[in-house]
UniProtKB/Swiss-Prot annotation:
Pathway as given in its UniProt record: tRNA modification; N(7)-methylguanine-tRNA biosynthesis
Species of provenance: Chlamydia trachomatis serovar D (strain ATCC VR-885 / DSM 19411 / UW-3/Cx)
GO biological-process terms attached to the record: RNA (guanine-N7)-methylation; tRNA methylation
Enzyme active site: 129
Protein name: tRNA (guanine-N(7)-)-methyltransferase
Taxonomic lineage of the native organism: Bacteria, Pseudomonadati, Chlamydiota, Chlamydiia, Chlamydiales
Gene name of the record: trmB
GO molecular function, one term: tRNA (guanine(46)-N7)-methyltransferase activity
Protein's UniProt keywords contain Hydrolase: no
Length: 224
């Protein structure tokens, strides 16, 4: 199964949310998201197992590895670029992964329109774009509204993890998460990951360039 075997199920002018070939397409610049009736997680995965979600899935190395480790845990991979979605889909097929759903679209749109409260045991954000220029910071994932939305979708005791090579991004994200979640690590609330994080393509890329990898974890407590 090759990446190019996956085709977009619509032309741009006819775009609409739809699920095909284990991919949920959430198009940009669309105004009728609520018209799509989202299936239940049980219908999508054909089981009642716990669900974890990775954002910024890239080429899918990390999430496919996680899905293969434990078939009883369902995974959702969210990636906005279709060329990368194709690579995730190809890996999923070639490794015969049955506990993975790919979302092709913006994480914020997927969460706000299609993810119900207390859906996820864990959310992992792997190497998001740091948008380092000040004028671009409005595009960062870790802003108040979206962190609140991620918190909403976690079960009590659920975990939100961020891995990044950008220290300034890390510190800013921690500042936001401290408003809504409980830190899972002692102050300064992050660790330097030496190894054993996983097979992320971006992790391997930044390590090859001599970059440090940082990881932080936050927990949704009772009453939050």
């Amino acid at each position: 199964m090759k990446p190019q075997d996956l085709k977009l199920p619509y032309f741009w002018e006819e775009r609409s949310p739809q699920i095909a070939n284990h991919v949920f397409y959430v198009p940009n610049y669309y105004s009728r998201y609520e018209e799509f009736v989202m299936p239940t997680w049980q219908e999508l995965f054909a089981n009642n197992g716990p669900i974890c979600c990775e954002l910024c899935s890239g080429n899918g190395d990390w999430v496919v590895e996680q899905a293969l480790k434990d078939a009883s845990v369902n995974w959702i991979a969210v990636e906005k670029r279709f060329d990368r979605v194709r690579k995730i889909w190809s890996k999923m097929g070639n490794y015969r992964v049955n506990n993975l759903l790919i979302v092709c679209g913006e994480a914020q749109t997927f969460f706000s329109h299609y993810v119900s409260d207390a859906s996820f045991q864990k959310i992992v954000v792997n190497f998001p774009d740091p948008w380092p220029k000040f004028r671009h910071r409005k595009h960062r994932l870790f802003q108040d509204l979206f962190v609140q939305d991620m918190m909403r979708t976690l079960v009590v005791g659920g975990q939100l993890t961020l891995a990044t090579d950008d220290y300034n991004y890390l510190v800013n994200a921690i500042t936001v998460m401290l408003k809504y979640l409980s830190p899972g690590l002692k102050s300064p609330h992050y660790i330097n990951v030496k190894d054993n994080y996983g097979g992320s393509w971006f992790e391997n890329l930044w390590r090859s360039k001599g970059q440090e990898i940082f990881c932080t974890e936050f927990i949704k407590r009772v009453g939050i």
